[in-house]
């Protein structure tokens, strides 16, 4: 049984491993397969299967390694084979571009199709949700209508790639997208990006003068409105900085192509500066629980010490290049957002939310569900934190319930013939 006191932090995979009493079943075998993406990268596909399944799922995050994650254990208990592709850039924000990450997804889906599965699902958890929504959006387009460039202008070969649409999509604690997640969390009181200690007192979310308290903040509606507008402006400034970097690089490369370039031009053409983005854990909803109330506890995915999460070396979007910022972490420029991509979904979709999630709040989950373009969509609310752990000590473990609901939904949505093993596995469990 998971212990709600064991982990106070849920960012990344903290607290997300499968439960000791609910591992992958003994008759499910693990094999590892090299998967070659269309653009030539090689990723690893960790594949859990009994061997007689007709339905398989891809479970992936754009930068996390999910092999010990709880969802594969629960899905295999429901008779669903699972492919867990490792992203090409594990734990790396510096080069993460979602337009390339969806080629990793494509390689995993193609692998499952070659294996002969009749139905293929995408099961997107947390940041895997918007990643899969983005993949699906592009996969459903005619190849010539797919994106040809990243937000930074880099060419991407989506038109030539095999991008097989899934038969169904499941979202579990999916958020709005990494860019929107960060835009809701950036501290807009930062005055100078080169000085992480700089601050505008009138926008400081951790000032008692503005309503903060370590035991629970109370922010005035007027402050909240100014704060949110200033968050967008900070992201816009960071976008401008990133685009200036890209423009200098592009101009230098143009001079090289035209001939007569100087040594300085060649250095400028190769220069890819890495810049920190400080103070990215300041979503007011994490500290004032009266704003869009839910079952969440005080604090963010990173815990309840904002000094550590905002000024420590680890945090969302902490180190970026212009390319990764614009593609992944910008709430204004990233293509991988639920708002942009969910309307394209036409397949059956199951949307599962945890009521104590500190990354996605009731207004967010309602918006995501409303954006889903399919008319065949179902929603389930489960008491749990971001990674499906009990909110309070002594509460039941919600993870088996989530796995069971996914199994039931798959059995309802797909044929009896395809899902005979699903029902047998579910009943045996």
What positions do the PLM features span?
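N-terminal cap/lid segment of alpha/beta-hydrolase-fold proteins
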Residues: 2-53, 391-392, 396-399
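Primarily recognizes the serine-hydrolase "nucleophile elbow" in alpha/beta-hydrolase
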Residues: 119-194
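Conserved alpha/beta-hydrolase
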Residues: 72-93
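Short beta-strand/loop motif that positions the catalytic acidic residue
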Residues: 345, 351-353
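Catalytic active-site module of serine/aspartate enzymes centered on a nucleophile-bearing elbow/loop
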Residues: 383-429
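Catalytic nucleophile-loop/oxyanion-hole region of alpha/beta-hydrolase
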Residues: 88-121, 395-400
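Conserved alpha/beta-hydrolase "acid-adjacent" motif
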Residues: 181, 358-364
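Alpha/beta-hydrolase
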Residues: 202-340
């Amino acid at each position: 049984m998971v212990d709600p006191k064991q982990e106070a932090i849920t960012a990344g995979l903290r607290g997300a491993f499968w439960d000791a009493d609910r591992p992958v079943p003994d008759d499910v075998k693990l094999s590892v397969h090299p998967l070659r993406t269309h653009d030539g990268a090689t990723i690893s596909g960790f594949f859990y299967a009994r061997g007689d399944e007709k339905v398989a799922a891809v479970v992936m995050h754009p930068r996390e390694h999910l092999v010990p994650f709880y969802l594969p254990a629960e899905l295999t208990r429901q008779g669903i084979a699972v492919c867990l592709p490792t992203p090409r850039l594990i734990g790396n924000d510096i080069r993460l571009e979602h337009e390339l990450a969806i080629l990793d997804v494509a390689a995993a889906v193609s692998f499952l199709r070659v294996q002969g599965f009749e139905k293929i699902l995408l099961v997107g958890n947390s940041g895997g949700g918007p990643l899969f929504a983005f993949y699906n959006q592009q996969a459903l387009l005619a190849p010539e209508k797919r994106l040809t460039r990243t937000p930074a202008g880099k060419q991407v070969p989506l038109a030539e790639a095999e991008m097989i649409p899934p038969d169904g999509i499941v979202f579990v604690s999916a958020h709005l997208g990494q860019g929107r997640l960060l835009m809701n969390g950036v501290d807009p009181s930062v005055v100078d990006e080169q000085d992480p200690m700089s601050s505008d007192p009138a926008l400081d979310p951790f000032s008692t003068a503005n309503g903060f308290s370590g035991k629970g903040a109370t922010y005035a509606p007027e402050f909240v409105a100014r704060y949110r507008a200033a968050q967008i402006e900070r992201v816009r400034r960071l976008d401008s900085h990133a685009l200036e970097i890209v423009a200098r690089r592009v101009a230098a490369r143009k001079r090289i192509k035209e001939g007569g370039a100087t040594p300085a031009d060649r250095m400028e053409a190769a220069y890819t500066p890495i810049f920190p983005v400080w103070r990215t854990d300041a979503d007011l909803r994490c500290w004032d629980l009266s704003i869009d109330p839910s079952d969440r506890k005080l604090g963010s995915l990173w815990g309840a010490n904002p000094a550590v999460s905002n000024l420590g070396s680890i945090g969302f979007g902490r180190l970026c290049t212009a390319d990764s910022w614009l593609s992944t972490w910008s709430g204004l420029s990233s293509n991988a957002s639920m708002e942009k991509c969910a309307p394209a979904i036409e397949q059956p979709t199951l949307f599962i939310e945890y009521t104590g999630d500190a990354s996605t709040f009731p207004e967010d989950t309602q918006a995501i569900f409303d954006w889903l373009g399919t008319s065949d969509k179902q929603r389930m609310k489960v008491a749990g934190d971001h990674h499906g752990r009990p909110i309070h000590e002594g509460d039941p473990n919600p993870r088996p319930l989530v796995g069971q609901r996914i199994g039931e939904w798959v059995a309802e949505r797909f044929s009896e013939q395809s899902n005979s093993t699903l029902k047998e596995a579910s009943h045996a469990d």
